[in-house]
C-alpha cells in the first residue's frame, strides 16, 4: 500500500507539474508580447489597457486559470503525501486539468459572450497548443465525471465533498458553523429573502456570541485573534446557508481592518471591542452615484469648521446603512478634484440605529432604500449627508488626505472574503442540485443518471474545489504577511464566475421548479449574480490582475 501511494504521489508530481511548467512558459510568452506592445505604444497602462481590453483582460483570465491549476495540483500532492488522496480527490484533480486545459486551448469564458484562448495572442502557435494537449485524453472525460458524481452521491453526509486539505482545527470551525446554519439559517433563508426584510437581530446576537464579528480582531481588543484562513472557512459556511448572513461579517471585517491598520490607539480601544461584541454594526460609505469603480472621483466633501468637519454629499449602494450605528465615510478633505484619490479621508462616524418605520433618525442623514434582486437581508440605501457634523477625533488615524491609501490596505482581505462567500454560494447550489437530481425521476430513473445532468454536477464539484484552493492560497499568503493583491484578485475573479455558473446550472437541473420562488435555487441565482459586480467588478478585477502581472 505504501508503494502504491508513493507511486501515485510521484505520478501526480511528475505529470501535472510538467504540464504547469509548460503553461508557465506560455504565460511568459504572452506576457513578453503584451509588455512589448505596451512599450511600443508609449501609452501609460490605463490608456493602453483601454485600447486592448479583450487581450489584456484575457491574459488575466489565462493567468488565473494557470494559478488555479497550480493550487489544485499542490492540493493533490499534499493529500498524497498524507496518504489521503482517495479516488474522489484524484478524479477532481484529473478532471480539473482536462477541463481547464480544454478551455485554455479553446476558449475561457470571461463572460457569457466573451472568450479568450491562448492562440488569440500572436506569440502562441499550434506547436505550443500541441505540447499541452498531447498530455490529455479529452474523449473519456464524461466517464470520469459519471464516476465522480456517483461517489459524490454516497459522500453527501460530508460537509465538503472533497478533503479540503485543511488542518483539523479549521474543519472543526466549519462543522460548528454548518450546525449553526442547520439550526438557524437554512430553513429561514428563503423566507427572509421573499419577505425582503432585515435578517433578525437574534441572528446577529447569535453570531456575536460565536465571535464572528471579532474573528480576526486581536484578543487584546476582545476578538478571537484568528487568521484570514479561518475567516474564509467561516464566510464560506455562513454564505452557504445564506449570503446575507455570510456577508454580515464582511461589514465588520472592513471596518476592523481599517481601524487596526491606521486607527489611533484611542480609536482602537474605543471601537474594536464594540465591533467584536456585535455592539457596533458598521456600514461602509464609499460609493457615490457617479463614482463606482473610480473612487478617486468622489465629490462628497468634508469641510473644516471650528475644529470639526461638516460632511455633505450623496452616497449609494450602502449596505446595512439603516441598522448600522457606525458609518465609515470616505470624503474629500482637499477640495481640489484634480487631486483625485490623494485628497480623500476616512471618517468613523457614529449614528443612531434606524428602524423599519424610520430608517434614519439622525437629522443630517437621510436616505431611500434601493430594492434589489438578491443579496437581501441587510438592505441597500442611497444616502444624503447634509452638513453632518463630525468631531476631529473621528478622522481615521487623525490623518487627512490618507483615506484612499488606508482603504487600499483592506482590498486584499475584502476580495479574499468575497471569494470565500462565492465558494459558499456555489456549494449551496451544488448541494441543491445533487439532492434534486437524485430524487427527481423521469423516464423511470433519477435524472442524475443522465449524462448532461451529471456532467453539470461534476463541473460544479471540480470548479468549487479549484476556487476553494485558490481562495485558501490567497488567505495563507495574507496570513504569512505577503503581498497578495494578485492572488486575492484572481480568487475573487474566478470564484464569482464559479458561483454564477453553479447557480445557473443548478437551476437548469431543477427545470421549471427552479424558476419557482418557493425553491431555494431561485434565490441563490439572484444572490450569485452580485458577486461579479461588487468588491471590484469582473472587468475591473481583470484589469487589476493584468496590471499587477505586467508590472511585476
Describe the role of every protein-language-model region.
Residues 2-241, 245, 250, 262-267, ...:
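Alpha-helical interface subdomain recognition
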Residues 223-226, 293, 357-361, 394-400:
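Cytochrome P450 core scaffold surrounding the K-helix E-X-X-R motif
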Residues 290-293, 317-320, 337-338, 372-379:
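Short Gly/Pro-enriched turn/cap motifs at secondary-structure boundaries
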Residues 308, 312-363:
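A short core secondary-structure module
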Amino acid at each position: 500500500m505504501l508503494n502504491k501511494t508513493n507511486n501515485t504521489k510521484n505520478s501526480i508530481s511528475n505529470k501535472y507539474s510538467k504540464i504547469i511548467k509548460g503553461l508557465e512558459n506560455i504565460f511568459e510568452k504572452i506576457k513578453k508580447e503584451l509588455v512589448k506592445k505596451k512599450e511600443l505604444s508609449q501609452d501609460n497602462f490605463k490608456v493602453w489597457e483601454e485600447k486592448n481590453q479583450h487581450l489584456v483582460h484575457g491574459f488575466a483570465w489565462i493567468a488565473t486559470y494557470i494559478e488555479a491549476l497550480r493550487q489544485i495540483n499542490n492540493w493533490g500532492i499534499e493529500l498524497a503525501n498524507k496518504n489521503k488522496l482517495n479516488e474522489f480527490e484524484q478524479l477532481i484533480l484529473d478532471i480539473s486539468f482536462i477541463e481547464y486545459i480544454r478551455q485554455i486551448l479553446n476558449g475561457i469564458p470571461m463572460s457569457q459572450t466573451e472568450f479568450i484562448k491562448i492562440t488569440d495572442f500572436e506569440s502562441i502557435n499550434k506547436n505550443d497548443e500541441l505540447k499541452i494537449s498531447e498530455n490529455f485524453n479529452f474523449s473519456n472525460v464524461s466517464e470520469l465525471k459519471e464516476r465522480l458524481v456517483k461517489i459524490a452521491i454516497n459522500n453527501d453526509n460530508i460537509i465538503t465533498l472533497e478533503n479540503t486539505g485543511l488542518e483539523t482545527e479549521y474543519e472543526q470551525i466549519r462543522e460548528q458553523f454548518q450546525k449553526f446554519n442547520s439550526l438557524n439559517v437554512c430553513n429561514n433563508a428563503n423566507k427572509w429573502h421573499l419577505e425582503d426584510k432585515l435578517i433578525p437581530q437574534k441572528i446577529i446576537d447569535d453570531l456575536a456570541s460565536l465571535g464572528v464579528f471579532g474573528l480576526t480582531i486581536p484578543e487584546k481588543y476582545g476578538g478571537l485573534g484568528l487568521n484570514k484562513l479561518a475567516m474564509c472557512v467561516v464566510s464560506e459556511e455562513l454564505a452557504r446557508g445564506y449570503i446575507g448572513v455570510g456577508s454580515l461579517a464582511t461589514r465588520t471585517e472592513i471596518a476592523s481592518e481599517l481601524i487596526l491598520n491606521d486607527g489611533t490607539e484611542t480609536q482602537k480601544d474605543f471601537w474594536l471591542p464594540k465591533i467584536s461584541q456585535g455592539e457596533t454594526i458598521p456600514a461602509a460609505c464609499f460609493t457615490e452615484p457617479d463614482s463606482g469603480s473610480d473612487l478617486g472621483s468622489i465629490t462628497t466633501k468634508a469641510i473644516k469648521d471650528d475644529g470639526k468637519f461638516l460632511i455633505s454629499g450623496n452616497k449609494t449602494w450602502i449596505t446595512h446603512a439603516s441598522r448600522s450605528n457606525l458609518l465609515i465615510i470616505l470624503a474629500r478633505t482637499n477640495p481640489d478634484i484634480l487631486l483625485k484619490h490623494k485628497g480623500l479621508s476616512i471618517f468613523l462616524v457614529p449614528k443612531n440605529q434606524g428602524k423599519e418605520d424610520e430608517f434614519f433618525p439622525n437629522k443630517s442623514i437621510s436616505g431611500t432604500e434601493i430594492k434589489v434582486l438578491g443579496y437581501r437581508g441587510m438592505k441597500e440605501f442611497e444616502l444624503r449627508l447634509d452638513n453632518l457634523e463630525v468631531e476631529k477625533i473621528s478622522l481615521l488615524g487623525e490623518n487627512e488626505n490618507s483615506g484612499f491609501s488606508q482603504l487600499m490596505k483592506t482590498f486584499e482581505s475584502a476580495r479574499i472574503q468575497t471569494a470565500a462567500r462565492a465558494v459558499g454560494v456555489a456549494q449551496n447550489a451544488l448541494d441543491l442540485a445533487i439532492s434534486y437530481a437524485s430524487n427527481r425521476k423521469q423516464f423511470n430513473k433519477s435524472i442524475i443518471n443522465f449524462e448532461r445532468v451529471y456532467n453539470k454536477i461534476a463541473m460544479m464539484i471540480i470548479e468549487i474545489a479549484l476556487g476553494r484552493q485558490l481562495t485558501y492560497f490567497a488567505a495563507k499568503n495574507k496570513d504569512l504577511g505577503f503581498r497578495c493583491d494578485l492572488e486575492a484578485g484572481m480568487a475573487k475573479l474566478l470564484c464569482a464566475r464559479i458561483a454564477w455558473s453553479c447557480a445557473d446550472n443548478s437551476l437548469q437541473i431543477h427545470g421549471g421548479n427552479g424558476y419557482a420562488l418557493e425553491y431555494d435555487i431561485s434565490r441563490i441565482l439572484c444572490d450569485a449574480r452580485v458577486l461579479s459586480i461588487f468588491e471590484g467588478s469582473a472587468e475591473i478585477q481583470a484589469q487589476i490582475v493584468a496590471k499587477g502581472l505586467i508590472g511585476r
